[in-house]
Amino acid sequence: MIKVYIGLGSNLDVPQSQLKKAIIAMEMVPSTSVVKTSSFYRSKPVGPQDQPDYVNAVVELDTELSASVLLDYLQAIENEQGRERKIKWGARTLDLDILLFGDEIINNDRLQIPHVEMHNRGFVLLPLNEIFPDCMIPGVGAVSSLLQEDNADDLVKLI
């Protein structure tokens, strides 16, 4: 089994419910199990600010799937929950990002793992640190150190 960390985000159609539905859907992915779920956090949007705040979380999975097959399942979950890919950084019902996939480094047309912006985003670092406090991002460093550098003060823990 490979340890995988997934970033979840939503700011449309009752975001907390969207995240809960996505976690249940991830439990149905073949050869994959949900191990841990972080608390949910409210955060300001990245990009255009004329949209609702986001609700974010991180989930730890164990999987036997390849990263690309897992991505297919995650994108299917996004689509089932009404995800539309119209505007970069636009409002969305659901965003599921593979943050880390074991110790693999992947850089192709479909995937960049570790997720290319995760080290700059408090809304990823704080929930990731909550469920994986010893996390090291390959080529970047310890999540706990990055959190000290990043301003995660604007995050509000919801549940």
Model-derived features: positions:
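N-terminal beta1-alpha1 ligand-phosphate binding loop
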Residues: 1-32, 38-44
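Flexible, gly/pro- and Lys/Arg-enriched active-site loops
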Residues: 36, 45-54, 65, 71, ...
